[in-house]
Amino acid sequence: MRRNGYWFGCLLGAVMLLVGCQGTEEPLTTVEGLDWREETPVWSMVSTAPEDFGITYDDLTDLDGYPLDKLAAYCLGADGVFAEDGFDQLYCRFVEAPRTWVTYVSLLPEEEQKILCEHTALAAASWYADSNEFSESLDVLEKAYSSGAEEVVISMLRSEYENAAV
């Protein structure tokens, strides 16, 4: 009898422990009006030197798997057909994740910002004949960043886009 009481007590204790651990979980933050274009940057360093990423321009590489920081370094060091493919990918990355793109580019020196903005805007105006995604993204970004380094990059993009679209 005593043995059954021991096991019953153990079982009851385990059940109470499990039930107590399964309380209602509430989110740590509320998600009100979360922008669908919200992204989380994942770059590990800010460098635009192709050699920092082991980039060589010996043959055409598949740039789809390049993270944004490596792609930007690739574009800034490339010329000819290498640059064309790189800036095409850079435009696609902007459309996919405009906030991440702008945040990363805003960390770079002004000269490199200008190059990346110019070629990305040119791709939007020339190659893609503005599929409206670019313009809509710029509108959203201008509302989200009304000052700071990101605003400078967005203004640069808008200016380059308007010049290219003429």
Sequence positions of predicted segments:
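C-terminal motif of bacterial Sec signal peptides marking the signal peptidase cleavage site
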Residues: L17-G20
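Bacterial N-terminal signal peptides that target proteins for export
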Residues: M1-F8
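Non-catalytic all-alpha helical scaffold/repeat segments
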Residues: E25-V166
